[in-house]
Amino acid sequence: MRSFDMKYSVLMPVYRKENPFYFYRAALSMMKQSVSPDEFVLVCDGPLTEELDAVIRKLEETWSEQVKIVRLPENRGIGPALAAGVESCRNNLIARMDSDDIACPERCEKQLVQFRGNPALALASGAIAEFEMDSLEKAANMQWTIDTPKELVEIPEDCCITGTRTLPCGYEEILIFARKRNPMNHMAVMMRRDAVLSVGNYRAVKGAEDYELWVRMLQAGYRAENLPDVLVYARTGNGMMQRRGGLAYAKENIRLQTHFYKSGFLTFPEYISNCAVRVAASILPVGIRGYLYQKKLRERMHA
């Protein structure tokens, strides 16, 4: 572990349907960062399974001074869960992490350097590598127990990378990009707690809690940057393409774009264009939608 003059909190929500093996790998990847976190806030979004609670007990036993558990009595969704987590963090810098992804070992160190170099920075993320289950998970997932040596669950060694999602790095480019798409990779975000709270924290915006928050922060004049480096291995599969389609998904997208337009973030032509693109993508068959998504990722990988 390397020492650093800036402290940060990790914020990770978890709910009962999470795979305990994935959860443990995700948590270890953050606790074993090259610059270790001062605090690890786990928000339990409603009652969990015994297997997930066993992982939490193991984390508390190993890192009793850092791990802080916030338990919500019922499942409220990721927006309210993250809002509760932000309020519970004791440090101003917060590293967001999903409960089924794997952070690169120097992710947080790179972001701390980024924040130290730009005192005006309030929001930052980086590239993500989307991956499928590696051989370790295929071999161990079914028989894994909480007593599996943690060295075996830290880093994906031969995972199948299906694509890399890169984003514009500079503030001006992010402002332009945000008018069409989410400008940050949520699972790789580091943010300033005071800035997030000043614009009202996370809200219950189904499927876009992060994007809606970023837009409010950008509208308030907060600075954002992205690193070109891959910071997180993000897990794909598990019905991702199905969740990104259908009439309900199209309606949610239109509702979000309408909100952006009414708030003054989008012009009317941008609003119409965004809605048309999202509706068209939502009604495509799953296979075609998945093909186009992977094609776009491959183009990014070789750009």
What are the residue ranges of the model-derived segments?
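Conserved nucleotide-sugar donor-binding catalytic segment
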Residues: 10-13, 149-163, 168-248
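Short, well-formed alpha-helical segments that are part of the catalytic scaffolds
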Residues: 17-32
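Conserved donor NDP-sugar-binding/catalytic core segment of glycosyltransferases
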Residues: 106-162
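Glycine-rich, basic loop-to-helix element that forms the pyrophosphate-binding segment
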Residues: 72-89, 110
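Short aromatic/hydrophobic "clamp" motif used to bind/position activated sugar donors
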Residues: 94
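Acidic donor-binding segment of Leloir-type glycosyltransferases
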Residues: 28-71
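The conserved acidic donor/metal-binding loop of glycosyltransferases
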Residues: 98-102, 127
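Cell-envelope/extracellular polymer assembly enzymes that use nucleotide-activated donors
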Residues: 7-11, 29, 39, 212
